[in-house]
Structures are given as C-alpha cells and as structure tokens.
C-alpha cells in the first residue's frame, strides 16, 4: 500500500461505518480519533502510551465504564477528561465505533515505496557555501528545538534570549528531534505520521532540506556519531528505516512484521526507542512488542544486525544511555519495559542483557530523556527514571542496584538534568489535575526534593519542599494564542507558520497548566519547561529554579532539545 495514501484510505474505509454508531450524535468518530486519540492509542488502535483499543481488548470491559473513561478521564494515566468536547451520546457512539472497528489496512515496509516519497526541499550544498556560519544566532549550538504537538510544528528558538526564530510544518504530531553531532547545523525531526525531515539551522529561517515518508506512524530517531546515517523507527508498519544523514536517501529497511515475542510466538512488533552510541558503530533498536533489542552495525556493508538481545520485558518504550566517565561512557542502553516494570540494561559491548532493574509493581517506568550523573557523596554514577502510573522517581547505580525511590505528587513522563544544575527536574504530567502543574527539583547529591515549581491558573510559585515556604511568585496570567496561517518560507519548499510575541486577549476561563519536559538552555544557565494546556514554555534559572519569563503563543509545546546540551549526551 502506498504510504502517501494510507491516511486517506484508512479514513475512508471507516467513515461510512461511523454513521452507524452515532445514535443522536453527529460526531465524525474516525476524524476525532485520528486527531485526538491516535497519538497515544495508535492508528490501528493497538495502544502505546494509551491502552489497546482493539475490539478483543475492549470486549472485556463494560460499555458504561469505557464511556465514563472518555468523559471523566483516568487518574494517574495520560487519559484526560473529554467532557468539554464529548456529550454522553458522543461518548457512547465512540465506544460503539471502537467496539466494532475492523482493521482493513495491510501495511508492509517497502524500501522502494519509501524511496518514492524522498523529496528534496532545498539545496544543502549551496546553502552551506552561502552561509558557512549561523545567520540567526551566534552559533548553531545556541539553538533549541521545540515541538508543537497538536499544530504539527517544529520550532527553532534562540536559547540565549528565548526568541522564536522559525516554525515549520513537519508532519502530524511531531514527536522527536535530534541533531547531527559531527555537523550540528543539520537537524532532524520525526512525526507520528511518519515524516522524517532534515533542516539546516545555520541558514536563515532554518529551512527544511529534505523529507521522506518512512511509515504511517513513527516514533524513534537517532543519528550516528560519525554524522553519516540517520535511522527512524516505525510503529506502523513495524520496522526501521536507515537513511543517508546528508541527503535523507533511504538506504535500508528493517522489517519487524515477523519476530519472536516474549512467549516464543511469531508476531509483528512496533519499534520504540532508537539510540546511537559513542561506544561503537552501533544503533540500538527496541522492538516494543517482542521484548528484545536489535543492535545494528552501520560500519559494515549493508548495515547488518549484529546483536539480538531477547527477553527484556513486555512493552518496551523509551531509553537512555549511561554517562559513566571513561571507557564505559555510553556502553549501556537502558530501556523501559512498561509491561514488566523494569529498566532493561543492554550491553553494547557484550550484546547481551546485563541486568534488569525492577522499578516496582505497576510503576510503568518512562524516563523520557532520562538522567545519568555522578554523585560525589556516594562516589558513583547514578541513573533515574520517573514512573507513569505512580508519583515515583527511581534511582539506581551502575551495579544495577536501586539506591533510592523518591515520591512525587503524580506520574511523570520526563526527568532531566545537566552539569549546570544541582537538580533532577521531574515532571508529574500524568498525575491528577490537582498536581500535574508541578515539577520536582530533586537534589542530585542528597536525593531529596529541595524545591517544587508549581504553576496555577493565575500565579506561579517556587516552593521550598521541606518548609513549604513560597520562595518566589510570578504572574502566570494566560492569554489567547495568536495564530497565523501557513505560508511559504524564505528558502526551500516546506511550509512555515509565522510567530509573534505579541500577547492575545486574556483567557476568560484559565485552565490548570500541565507541565512537562525540562531541558537546559542558554549554556546551561536556563531550564525550559513546556506547558501543554496553556500553550507556552516557561524559562527558569537552572541553579535556583527561579522563574524568568514565558515564551507564549504556542500550541501544546512538548519536546524541547538543546543542541549544545545534547552534543555531550550519548545517544541523545
């Protein structure tokens, strides 16, 4: 099936059926699912961050329970309330549609079809000659990327002042961005709709250079440390696509439609996390549904799989690498198994499973970018993840033993740190609405929570976690987002959306801010925190946690990526 036609054909195949379940509802269930639900539950309803919504999984549940989950959300999960958008009839209709949904798609990873979508958008070599140095910033290392999930945008921000430089359409629900560490003027993004895009962040306006449709639904992305190759991972069709990092020409497809799972059965698997490593010429590729990790050697002809590490755990998700100094730097690929509540430790050197770190019953580890740092007090390297299902930060050492569990107010998705901050910054974005507006600042030496960033509907606070004393307050007034239509860029053929820092009207009914993903910026002096529900990014002092200012007029900002910071993080 042609990748470019998958979305429209899938929608058409179920559109007629949607009217059968509407009752008195006029909701277009396929369209609503595609826009609002697909990101967490998948295009073929197989689940991911969200639950499996295929009929066989749903038939075990009562319809009224499912309807209530749509209307009221599910506490300590990523499932929000939809009562602002759904009537009870709408929710009943959606449940009926899901219960009777049939997968009529036939996805297969085909390298020739993928090559047919490869598109040149600007002349890379000409731009490099014309603009040998960064134009819009002092250095390309000053750039921070941000994704606006629901607007399908990649933004480029000058991290030294918070100025939004440009915003680019880059596929539905842009998920991950990375940079080429050998030549950091080149950046890449992957959207959940399977579009891989390459940008030149030194040229004016950060133009898109090329794009290729690697699948229908994608997640992971990694660039080899030698700067030659970029690899993207797919949920649908299962597999990964390796491309030339200077052109995006597709070179090889790794099909995972028939792999051995944890039960010894042959089935298709989605590809979750991907990571390069400075330890050797390897990519790690996590097979989400098979509980195993492939290790690819990109230095050899035809880029073979040279390692196959099985039995890690059920439902593999995101991962990060260790930062132990010396020869073991980047040696271990630490992958979350959300179905088995473990962090699997995959050894690039031995190409085996070195250990499993059990995070606790039903914790569902989700490290996001993860954290690895040297604890001077203990005299050893430590690593940390947050947990989706409970408010818990789990810390372990390089002997793969847990050294501390730190409670927070709710489940999280991201935990980050950097040399210039004394803290681990842990979000609680999957917690309850009463607490998902908090980020915990955990002391990297004492492993105790020192401070909490808490943003209310009108006021933000920095709180001393021990005394509960408010250390700082700031104006957190919410403003309507000022939007612009798509337009043509100064250079290239992609579409951009203009930005203004002019504030819109004050929001009449403010919402609870939902904070996530802390990322260093401005040479480590700042930390950026995204706010999903308010459409802005907060900037804070890295060493103190004090608020500085907001970047407004964004739509569900999610992932941020500092080029300078990630240059020194293995696999990031």
Features from the language model and the residues they span:
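Intrinsically disordered, low-complexity sequence elements enriched in Ser/Thr/Gly/Pro
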Residues: 1-3, 217
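Gram-negative bacterial Sec-dependent N-terminal signal peptides
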Residues: 3-21
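The N-terminal extracellular segments of secreted preproproteins, especially immediately downstream
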Residues: 11, 20, 36-39, 242
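Predominantly soluble domains enriched in secretory-pathway, periplasmic, or organellar proteins
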Residues: 19, 23-27, 43, 67-72, ...
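Local sequence-structure signature of Cys/Sec-based thiol-disulfide redox active-site neighborhoods
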Residues: 27-35
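Extracytoplasmic electron-transfer domains, predominantly the class I c-type cytochrome c fold
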Residues: 39, 44-48, 54-103
């Amino acid at each position: 099936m042609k990748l470019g036609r998958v979305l429209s054909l899938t929608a058409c195949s179920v559109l007629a059926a949607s009217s059968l379940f509407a009752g008195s509802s006029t909701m277009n269930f396929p369209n609503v699912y595609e826009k609002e639900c697909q990101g967490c539950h998948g295009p073929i309803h197989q689940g991911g961050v969200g639950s499996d919504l295929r009929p066989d999984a749903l038939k075990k549940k009562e319809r009224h329970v499912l309807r209530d989950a749509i209307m009221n959300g599910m506490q300590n999960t990523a499932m929000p309330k939809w009562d602002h958008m759904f009537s009870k009839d709408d929710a009943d209709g959606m449940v009926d549609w899901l219960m009777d949904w049939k997968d009529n798609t036939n996805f297969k990873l085909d390298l020739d079809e993928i090559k047919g979508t490869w598109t040149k958008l600007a002349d890379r070599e000409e731009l490099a000659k014309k603009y040998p140095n960064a134009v819009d910033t002092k250095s390309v290392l000053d750039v921070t990327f941000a994704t606006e999930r629901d607007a399908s945008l990649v933004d480029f921000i000058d991290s030294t002042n918070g100025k939004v430089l440009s915003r680019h359409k880059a596929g539905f629900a842009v998920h991950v961005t990375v940079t080429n560490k050998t030549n950091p003027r080149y950046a890449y993004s992957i959207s959940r709709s399977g579009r891989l895009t390459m940008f030149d962040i030194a040229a004016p306006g950060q133009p898109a250079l090329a794009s290729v449709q690697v699948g229908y639904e994608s997640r992971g992305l990694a660039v080899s440390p030698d700067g030659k190759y970029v690899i993207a991972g797919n949920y649908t069709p299962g597999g990964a696509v390796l491309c030339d990092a200077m052109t995006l020409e597709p070179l090889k497809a790794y099909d995972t439609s028939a792999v051995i799972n944890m039960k010894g059965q042959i089935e298709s698997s989605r590809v979750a996390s991907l990571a390069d490593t400075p330890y050797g010429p390897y990519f790690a590729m996590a097979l989400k549904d098979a509980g195993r990790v492939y290790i690819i050697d990109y230095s050899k002809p035809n880029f073979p799989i040279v390692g196959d590490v099985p039995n890690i755990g059920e439902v593999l998700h995101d991962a990060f690498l260790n930062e132990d100094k010396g020869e073991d730097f980047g040696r271990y690929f630490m992958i979350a198994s959300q179905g088995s509540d473990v962090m699997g430790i995959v050894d690039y050197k031995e190409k085996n499973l070195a250990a499993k770190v059990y995070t606790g019953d039903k914790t569902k580890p989700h490290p996001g970018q993860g954290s690895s740092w040297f604890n001077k007090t203990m005299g050893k390297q430590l690593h940390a993840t947050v947990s989706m299902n409970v408010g818990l930060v789990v810390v372990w050492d390089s002997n793969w033993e847990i050294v501390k569990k730190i409670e927070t107010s709710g489940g999280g998705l991201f935990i980050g740190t950097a040399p210039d901050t004394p803290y681990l910054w842990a979000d609680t974005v999957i917690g309850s609405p009463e607490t998902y507006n908090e980020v915990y600042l955990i002391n990297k030496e004492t492993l105790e929570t020192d401070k909490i960033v808490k943003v209310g509907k009108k006021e933000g606070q920095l709180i001393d976690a021990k005394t509960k004393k408010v250390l700082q307050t700031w104006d957190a007034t919410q403003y309507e987002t000022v939007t612009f239509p798509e337009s043509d860029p100064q250079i290239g053929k992609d579409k951009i959306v203009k930005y203004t820092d002019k504030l819109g009207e004050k929001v009449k009914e403010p919402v609870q801010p939902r904070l996530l993903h802390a990322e260093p910026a401005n040479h480590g002096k700042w930390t950026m925190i995204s706010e999903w529900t308010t459409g802005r990014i907060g900037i804070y002092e890295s060493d103190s946690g004090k608020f500085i200012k907001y970047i407004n007029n964004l739509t569900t900002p999610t992932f941020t990526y500092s080029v300078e910071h990630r240059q020194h993080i293995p696999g990031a």
